[in-house]
């Protein structure tokens, strides 16, 4: 029984000799950063965006709580978010949040949505919410933030 429990606990970490997760970024997609209309910013640096998604910045100006919504596992948006913003593999992302919650630096990991449509609906409804969307499929009713002064259509946009 103990061996089974240990195997189950260690399985997500990868066994010795197994290949690590690779960050695979889908070609051609550009991530747009979308937020609730009341979020008091229009432009973030990539460093500020990382702090938000890593849980190091938990409030917008005026004490509005940041609510991070991440795409579903396996989606193109999630793959690009992990590679460009988190700079982590799926496994590293999970371990990061387990450790952060264990150290009581966060109450929980970002909320994972079941679909990008649900993410858009929640961003519209939840004050302080921030998420991502394929820049070619921006949902109506959300605020699109610029990153490093650039929109997703601009040359040199960092999230492609």
What is each of the regions a protein language model found here?
Residues 20-160:
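Exported/periplasmic ABC-transporter solute-binding proteins
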Residues 13-17:
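C-terminal segment of classical bacterial N-terminal signal peptides
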Residues 3-12:
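Sec-dependent N-terminal signal peptides
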Residues 1-3, 140:
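Generic structural signal for short, solvent-exposed loop/turn connectors between secondary structure elements
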